[in-house]
């Protein structure tokens, strides 16, 4: 009813985060710029923390839409799974694994590492973007830290973005994750 009244061609307040409706207030503009910069300039680990409904998912989707053509990205939104499943989904999204193919964790990481080196050599980049990261278990967070070890002497091979609600910030402050927290180069 309101669409006709206001002359809208579609509902602007849908329940799914459509990046074309992204509103960049001052804070979101800063976070969006930092996110794009962090991926482009190979900052390694990036975290985005915000309350429910503040636009984190929409920002992530908009950033994915605006990545340059040389950046390959995997977007993970189901975080109530094991790290092995996150790794398998990452490989699948990057076109490195068939959906029914089974790989050990070592072989999966090796395949991802080789792909990231190929991308770097060709002038490309690789990003792993994880939404709802507050649902990740401690083991998955520690494995993400280990994944961030994929690097050359000069470059991080995989740019890892974790986005989540304020609970994620509390989780990252835990003593057992101090090594991960030290690797976060951009924290918004």
Set out the residue ranges of the language-model regions.
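A short, basic N-terminal segment
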Residues: 1-42
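Conserved NTP-binding/hydrolysis module of P-loop NTPases
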Residues: 8-13, 72, 82-100
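Walker A/P-loop nucleotide-binding motif
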Residues: 41-62, 79
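Structural recognition of the conserved hydrophobic beta-strand(s) that form the central parallel beta-sheet
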Residues: 49, 127-131, 158-165
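Residues immediately C-terminal
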Residues: 54, 132-138, 146, 167-168
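A short helix-turn-beta junction within AAA+ P-loop NTPase domains corresponding to the substrate/partner-engaging
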Residues: 69-72, 175-188
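Mid-core helix/loop region of P-loop NTP-binding domains shared across ATPases and GTPases
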Residues: 82-85, 97-143, 152-155
């Amino acid at each position: 009813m309101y669409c006709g009244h206001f002359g809208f061609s579609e509902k602007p307040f849908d329940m799914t985060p459509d990046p074309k409706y992204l509103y960049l207030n001052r804070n979101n503009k800063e976070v969006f710029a930092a996110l794009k910069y962090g991926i482009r300039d190979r900052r390694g680990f990036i975290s985005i923390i915000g309350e429910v409904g503040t636009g984190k998912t929409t920002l992530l989707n908009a950033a994915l839409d605006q990545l340059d053509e040389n950046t390959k990205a995997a977007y993970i939104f189901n975080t109530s799974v094991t790290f092995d499943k996150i790794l398998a989904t990452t490989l699948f999204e990057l076109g490195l694994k068939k959906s029914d193919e089974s790989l050990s964790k070592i072989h999966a990481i090796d395949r991802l590492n080789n792909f990231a080196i190929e991308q770097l050599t060709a002038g490309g980049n690789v990003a792993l973007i994880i939404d709802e990261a507050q649902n990740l278990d401690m083991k998955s967070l520690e494995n993400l830290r280990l994944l961030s070890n994929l690097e050359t002497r000069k470059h991080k091979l995989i740019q890892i973005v974790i986005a989540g609600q304020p609970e994620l910030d509390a989780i990252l402050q835990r003593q057992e994750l101090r090594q991960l927290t030290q690797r976060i180069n951009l924290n918004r």
